[in-house]
């Protein structure tokens, strides 16, 4: 039975009911709806709507229902209730009779669903932060195990300067750290309780909403009833955070795909996260990484869809807002799956140290060191940049690395070059010189790993 049938003289068309009903997806809010109902029952005691005995009877029945939901949430889908609020109320009435009909006094589904989705989002933030933390720890562990794996760093997908695989890992630790902090920020803003706002103008009962907020695990009650039932900022913020984090994970996946390719052969991915071809028996495809990359668009699409849904809505609640749930459910599920899969990808990775070093020795990635060497000899940097560019062209024509040129050859371009030039052209020298905070020197990378381990412990 619908919660609003008294006003209507005709039954809803089945096609409309199927179109309108949301139980098939908002059943995921069952636990939050029950917990919110327990909190509301206590508030109704304070204003004399329920006796203490009635409240205890309701709470006992709701707790029993909560146990049933947790043991088999899919069973909810066998019901034809309009939404999760209707389902909970119906099951409560089945357990306690007419007493269950008193629970909705002073409450609207508008503030009820606003509460439910906020409570659900708060719980997901905690779960997502746990997954992000685990992935960061796995990246730090991988970095610690690969501090001596020298590889090319890239700009424009061209070899640029030598780095280490550890330094690459730590870059993603930083990105995920920002994702984690954005979740913390979002949590603080969503930690206000909308229950007691009614349909839009507030409840007619003198509920202590601040106490109600505390009872339900919030810091404070919301300040404006009209805003409270209309607000979906927390959903947009979480979708935004998810989208940005998925961009980070997609970049991670793209790097892995490139590093794993036959052309690079920098890393070997575990059989546990790769698949084969139905035709080509030699194939070992990086499907886990490709799916992470592909799913980024799905999450970003949910953000765009939510913004488009909200942008033209007048205050207060509109049925359009029912469209918030499927997007946030799917996006956060997808994000969490991708975080966990990225950690699994790292779990079995093998770095081909010989191949990464071989690649780092090519592409004249030590050219900047030669420019800095000339600067140290008194040549202005802009001039040294030009000189080294000409030197690289010559080396390419001679099919030689810079460190393979003789001093005489160097002197064709600058007479300040001496035998000491070879000391600064080695890969180790290139790394050691990048010793400012955040640089790729082994000392700084080791410090970054130690700091991250302490921060994440």
UniProtKB/Swiss-Prot annotation:
Pathway assigned to this chain's UniProt record: Amino-acid biosynthesis; L-arginine biosynthesis; L-arginine from L-ornithine and carbamoyl phosphate: step 3/3
EC numbers: 4.3.2.1
SUPFAM superfamilies (alphabetical): L-aspartase-like (SSF48557)
Keyword list, A-Z: Amino-acid biosynthesis, Arginine biosynthesis, Cytoplasm, Lyase
InterPro entries: Arg_succ_lyase_C, Argininosuccinate_lyase, Fumarase/histidase_N, Fumarate_lyase_CS, Fumarate_lyase_fam, Fumarate_lyase_N, L-Aspartase-like
Sequence intervals crossing the membrane: none
Record's catalysed reaction(s): 2-(N(omega)-L-arginino)succinate = fumarate + L-arginine
An annotated Gene Ontology molecular function: argininosuccinate lyase activity
Pfam families named in the record: ASL_C2 (PF14698), Lyase_1 (PF00206)
Record has Cell inner membrane as a keyword: no
Cytoplasm is among the record's keywords: yes
GO cellular component: cytosol
Gene Ontology biological process terms, A to Z: arginine biosynthetic process via ornithine; L-arginine biosynthetic process
Coiled-coil zones: none
Localization, UniProt: Cytoplasm
Family assignment from sequence similarity: Belongs to the lyase 1 family. Argininosuccinate lyase subfamily.
NCBIfam families associated with the record: argH (TIGR00838), PRK12308.1 (NF008964)
Name of the featured protein: Argininosuccinate lyase
Name of the gene encoding the protein in the UniProt record: argH
């Amino acid at each position: 039975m619908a919660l609003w049938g008294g006003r209507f003289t005709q039954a809803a068309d089945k096609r409309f009911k199927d179109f309108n009903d949301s139980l098939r997806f908002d059943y995921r809010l069952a636990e939050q709806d029950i917990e919110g109902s327990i909190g509301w029952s206590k508030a109704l005691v304070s204003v004399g709507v329920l006796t203490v005995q009635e409240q205890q009877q309701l709470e006992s029945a709701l707790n029993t229902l909560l146990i049933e939901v947790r043991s088999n949430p899919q069973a909810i889908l066998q019901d034809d209730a309009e939404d999760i609020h209707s389902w909970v109320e119906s099951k409560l009435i089945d357990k306690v009779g007419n007493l269950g009909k008193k629970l909705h006094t002073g409450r609207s589904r508008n503030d009820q669903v606003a509460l439910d989705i906020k409570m659900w989002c708060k719980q997901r933030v905690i779960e997502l932060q746990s997954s992000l933390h685990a992935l960061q720890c796995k990246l730090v562990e991988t970095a610690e195990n690969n501090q001596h794996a020298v590889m090319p760093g890239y700009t424009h997908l061209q070899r640029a300067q030598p780095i280490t695989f550890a330094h690459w890992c730590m870059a993603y630790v930083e990105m995920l750290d920002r994702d984690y902090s954005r979740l913390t920020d979002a949590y603080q803003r969503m930690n206000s309780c909308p229950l007691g706002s009614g349909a839009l103008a507030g409840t007619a009962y003198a509920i202590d909403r601040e106490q109600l907020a505390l009872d339900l695990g919030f810091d404070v009650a919301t300040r404006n009833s009209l805003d409270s039932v209309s607000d979906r900022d927390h959903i947009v913020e979480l979708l935004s955070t998810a989208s940005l984090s998925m961009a980070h994970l997609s970049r991670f996946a793209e790097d892995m795909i490139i590093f794993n390719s036959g052309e690079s052969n920098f890393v070997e991915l575990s059989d546990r996260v790769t698949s084969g071809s139905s035709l080509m028996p030699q194939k070992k495809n990086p499907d886990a990484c490709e799916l992470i990359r592909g799913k980024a668009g799905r999450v970003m699409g949910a953000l765009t869809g939510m913004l488009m849904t909200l942008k033209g809505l007048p205050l207060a609640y509109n049925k359009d807002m029912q469209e918030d749930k499927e997007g946030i459910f799917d996006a956060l599920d997808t994000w969490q799956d991708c975080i966990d899969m990225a950690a699994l990808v790292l779990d079995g990775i093998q770095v081909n140290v010989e191949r990464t070093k071989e690649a780092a020795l090519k592409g004249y990635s030590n050219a900047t060191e030669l420019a800095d060497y000339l600067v140290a000899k008194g040549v202005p940097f802009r001039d040294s940049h030009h000189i080294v560019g000409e030197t690289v062209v010559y080396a390419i024509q001679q099919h030689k690395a810079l460190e393979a040129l003789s001093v005489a050859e160097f002197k064709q371009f600058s007479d300040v070059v001496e035998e000491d030039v070879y000391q600064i052209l080695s890969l180790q020298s290139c790394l050691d010189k990048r010793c400012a905070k955040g640089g790729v020197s082994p000392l700084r990378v080791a410090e970054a790993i130690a700091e991250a381990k302490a921060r994440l412990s």
